[in-house]
Amino acid sequence: MVAQIKGNGRLRITNVGGMNANNAEAENVRVITKFSGAIDGTVQLCDASVHVNGNYSTTPRTFDTVEVVRSAEDVRKLGIDVGDFVCFDPRSRITESGYIKSRFLDDKLSVGILQAFAQYLKDENLTPKRRVYVHVTVYEEVGHG
């Protein structure tokens, strides 16, 4: 999530959920704004030049040392604001055999299976012998297991 718009126009982000900053560097992201849609960007180390930054390899990757890069004059014009969500590219692929590989599938896949099952019951006009409840929580995304 966007935690701060820095004076240079770059975004400081904060973690919501299980993404680790070690896995965020150089990843493509979309900033989902309140009114302006989605804005594409890239997460970079704050001092990302390996040729100039002598501590590049040893700099800890935390959400205080990586940022989403945008030019200063464009950030506000784009409608980006504190609290907007930053979504990492899941790099989803379906192989020729039908195998689905992607990041962040754990909860989404489970919800998709439950939705498909409910749709199947409806389409086939089937009624289970017992009452079935579909319950989805968001506790993992706010720090609960």
Place the predicted regions along the sequence by residue.
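N-terminal hydrophobic/helix-forming segments and targeting peptides
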Residues: 1-145
